[in-house]
Amino acid sequence: MTRPSRLRSLLHRSALLLAACASLAPAAHAAKPLLTFKVDDTVTARVERADREHITVRFLPSGKTQTLDVIAADEEGHYHLSSDDYNFDGHRDLAMHATLGMVNDSYGIYLYDPTRQQFEPLHLPASDMPHGNCDDLVNVVAKPKERTLYSSCRGGPIWYTDAYRFDASGKMYLYQSSEAIPDDLRDLLDADSGPSSMLLTYDAQGKRVSRRPDAYGGGAVTFKVRPARLPLHDAMNDAPTRRYVVAGDTVEVIDASADFQWLKVRYRNPHAGAVQGWVSAKEAMGN
């Protein structure tokens, strides 16, 4: 072979090699995983982008694949992926989340089903069951020691927190939520702290099992008595008893009527011990 022929052959082979590398590069880029995590000791999930509205999960070592909808994204279609054991069954699950507004990070969660060896969407409680203050799962935090999934969102000046648990069949139910206290009453109760609320607790069947005052950040709700004398009642709408608290006394709120017209309070008298009774919210506010 002459020297020019050898040169042409070398250039031809170089061109073919460059073309092959160029054709492989996009494929390699497309296969780059968005997230890889161990579901359990035997299964690894490799998450790849399928298109703008879908992702593909490849389970290793089986090689089985599953296509999932993108169920949480911002207005531009952006989202983040993370994994955690959101239902506390020993298997890590998959979450998509995106920031909507200034502080609310909206979540869409897929739970791993070890029997079917695939992910299934986590659903909020049915329409006939209690629902929380947040319309969806927001700013999600899983606390395995409590076996509770927390969702919190901001509405105006108030942060709301919904707590979810899972029943024996694995279905999620609302465990705790909060009920807002009227603004005029919060002025009395929240003089030295953030907004208090009523903490509502439910069982797995959706029955409310307790309702109690809860201070901002947790703890007892208290207020200082404003009127010179604030009479105590044995029951709402009963005539006042001979017992009363006086201006400057600090009392703890332990219950409230459904319309917040009456507050049940406890006062720890240094001489007579703890006394409790109902007071008129209107009288307590000095109105």
Feature annotation, model-predicted:
Residues A30-Y79:
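Terminal domain-start segments
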Residues L188-P231, D238, Y244-A247, I254-D259, ...:
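SH3-family beta-barrel domains
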Residues N87-A98, E146-S151:
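Acidic/hydrophobic-patterned starts of short beta strands in beta-sheet-rich repeat architectures
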Residues V103-I109, I158-A163:
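Structural motif
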Residues D85-N87, P114:
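Calcium-coordinating acidic loop motifs
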Residues G248, L263-R268:
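SH3/SH3-like beta-barrel fold
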Residues R13-A25:
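Bacterial N-terminal signal peptides
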Residues Q118-A215:
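Short aromatic loop motif centered on NTY/YTY
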